[in-house]
Amino acid sequence: MKKKKIILFGVILAISITFMVGCTTSAYDIAVKNGYEGTESEWLASLNGTDGSDGSDLTITQIYNEAVQNGYERNFFEFLDEYLSLEYSPDSSEAINRCMRSAMIVQCKFNKRSYGLTRGEEYGQQGSGVIYAINKEQGSAYIITNYHVVYSSDSDTQTRVSNEITISPYGGSAISVTYVGGSAQYDIAVLKATDDYFSSTFPLAINLVNGDVTIGQSAIAIGNPAGEGLSATQGIISVESEEIIMEDIENSSSYVSTRVMRIDAAVNSGNSGGGLFNSAGELIGIVNAKSSDTSIENMAYAIPASIVSAVADNIIKNNGNFNKGTVGITITVTQTTGYLDENDCVRIAETVVISQVSGAASGLLQANDVVKAITIYGQTITVNRMFHLTDPILRTLPGDSVTITVERSGQTIDVTVVCS
């Protein structure tokens, strides 16, 4: 059942940092199950021996045999790959420090609408943002934040978007930015800044995650909680994808459905628009909401990176206007199955079927076609979930061509559609 949530207005907050929870059963996991009580770093140190003596007496084969005797079930080469690739870090400081270099405080000033001759009262609200793209030669950058951070229904501007927005990097001064464009439906806004700061070596653009996130994955949140400055917190991904109902930003009397990830981090005003990162420092989402039920704690939400990047790219390519292409199909999920992937992570597989065809897809696609893949701008994405189809289409503009691979009457067919 979809549940009503409330988006974060005003000062937005810093969220969660976490450590990666692996989906595989590692040699260290086996050791713990068999009574080992130390940390992974202490376990690794025990394998190396003390003062260079004990460890030198052990061979990798002996270590493998010991692991097998204690329940390890993989072959020697898998063990060798795991053992040699183990990286221990006492904390997530490396990822946090990198992510902090792409984080921004976002501050907006507004004047209240006034129906008299005098200008309305001035007020402000704060949030967070991330550097989406940077041009060192030009000293410019695109910044992503939430639309609700830069928008206020009480504003006296025609668009209700602030016309006085600044960003502040970690340890840096405020930089004026211009509003490029945004989408209230997807709660994404794009800002552009030009300043010598962006020609320096300190600022970094975010790295986007490649692929889907998993339950239990670490989530490092960098933001501006309560307007107190950039900081980091930690949590995990509780649900990798779900639909929630939120109040329409531009129309408080209506509601919109949006796809989000659920995280267990405590979210407070000030972190909206801030980045959610994995343990590798890759952007996995943008924090935007929390539960409106005051009796519920540690239930917050983030817009997935696949939506964030698609909407931002659309806005940038289309000169500030979000205008996605329309394929002309209605899709539904007819079957859902849980399974384990190659890393023993729990996943969901959905059978995505076309239920209605209209517009651009008329005469090309058919009802009951099972969608297998979509190719956009030369990139083919296998459709195992409904959002594998819907998210990439957000990147397209009217006139763009997409190829949809479907299964029809036992045959696989590639169908190219020009978006309307």
Where are these regions (language model features)?
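Collagen/collagen-like triple-helix sequence repeat recognition
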Residues: 23-86
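Terminal peptide-recognition signature
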Residues: 104-106, 129, 141, 145, ...
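Gly/Ser-enriched beta-turn/beta-hairpin loop segments
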Residues: 115-122, 170, 180-186, 241-261, ...
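Catalytic-histidine neighborhood of serine endopeptidases
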Residues: 133-186, 195-196
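Short glycine/Trp-rich loop-beta-loop segment that forms part of the substrate-binding cleft
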Residues: 166-168, 208-230
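Active-site loop architecture of trypsin-fold serine endopeptidases
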Residues: 112-113, 118, 122-123, 147-162, ...
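A conserved glycine-rich beta-strand in the N-terminal activation segment of trypsin-fold
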Residues: 87-94, 113-144, 174-176, 232, ...
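C-terminal recognition in membrane/secretory proteostasis and scaffolding
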Residues: 13-18, 54, 69-72, 192, ...
